[in-house]
Amino acid sequence: EIEKQDTIGLFGEDNIMLTDLILRMESNDLNNCSLVKSSPLVFRESPDESEIENYLNAGICPAGRVIRVVESYQNLDTRIQSGFDFSLYYSAINSFGNFNFSLNITKLEKFKQKAGNDFIRLIEAQENGIIPKELAISGFSDLLEKDGSPKIQANLKLIWNKGSWGLGLFGQHIGEFYETRNKLSDGSLWNVKAYNTISGYIDYRLNLNSNNSRIRLGIKNITDERAPLASDIFGYYFDKHDNLGRHYYLDLSYKF
């Protein structure tokens, strides 16, 4: 188990927006909207006439649409992680050729982030009814299988060659997790499903002018697996998943 104090990380755009909402609601005064406070990290455009009318009818000082949220790294208090890594390697040389096999599995069993002062302020505001219960506060408490932190990840690799021929096979598994920023109508969290891909290649080595050369034909994502749907910026977690689908490549190499 690893415990890190004063971990560095991002507070999160959603949480910054909630902080901005709290400041606006706590300082809301229709008699003098110029005194309303807001987060310096949230930039808005000027509200139009219809937006101003809607805000005033709701008893809230007008605010324009958000055009930019600035994030910076900060201390996020204590983080606790525990789990294990499993690795298996095997190689063999026989009449069928040379074989190399590897399997790596990572299992995360605990991943917790203690709430620092910024998170505590959001929690207290929600408990006091300043912000709705339906708005999720993310980035603290139990983070296991939440927002891009799957419990299990695995990679497999098999390489074979004999004479001039070679073959490679690769597998990847990224376990499921849940998005805390999205809730279904029944209150449950949005499930980002597990992601599995298989890729491979076949190549042939040849001698051209006494130099080693190689021609390789490969297929990435043989099963045409698509990234599971999520509310991240590209519609999926680009740092975890790939949405290119099946694609082929031809690689020619020549050593001078």
Locate predicted features.
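Generic long, charged, amphipathic alpha-helical segments
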Residues: 171, 180-197
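Hydrophobic, lipid-facing positions within transmembrane beta-strands of outer-membrane proteins
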Residues: 82-86, 152-156, 196-202, 246-252
